A protein has these predicted regions:
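Aromatic-rich beta-strand patches that line glycan-recognition/binding surfaces
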Residues: 23-27, 54-62, 90
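Surface-exposed, hydrophilic segments of mature proteins
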Residues: 38-40, 65-68, 78-80, 89-91
């Protein structure tokens, strides 16, 4: 199965500069029309100010929290949607930048993340 990043613009970071103004990057991104199922969220989190507290949060369409992280660096989690829904990704505090965002179905992520040769190779047919 082909890997598809469902995040609309993976090379555009989410930034929270504390102004509350969308022109300065204070915004969240919604991924609409996700089917029910299990997904992987992975991203790089930087924080140029406070190094404590929640840096990133994921919400569903009812603003119910799905995930939050206080980590700096590469963050990865899985989450399950019980019904078709929307997921919002928000840089949660001033100074946070979220980049290299990947949101994809867990079944495609798991097979690709293992790396190595495709399953049709064996130890005798692999091109070492």
């Amino acid at each position: 199965m082909q890997r598809i990043n469902l995040y609309p613009s993976p090379l555009t970071p989410l930034v929270n500069d504390g102004t509350g103004d969308i022109t300065h990057g204070d915004y969240d991104v919604a991924i609409d029309n996700l089917e029910a199922g299990t997904y992987v969220f992975a991203a790089d989190i930087q924080n140029s100010r406070a190094q404590t507290g929640i840096n990133v949060m994921l919400f569903d369409s009812d603003w119910s929290p799905i995930f939050n992280s206080t980590e700096i660096g590469h963050v990865k989690t899985t989450f399950t949607l019980k019904k078709p829904d929307r997921v919002r990704i928000r840089a949660f505090q001033v100074g946070v930048t979220i980049s290299n965002v990947n949101v994809e179905r867990a079944d495609t992520y798991a097979t690709a993340a293992g790396g190595g040769f495709p399953a049709f190779f064996t130890k005798d047919t692999a091109a070492y």
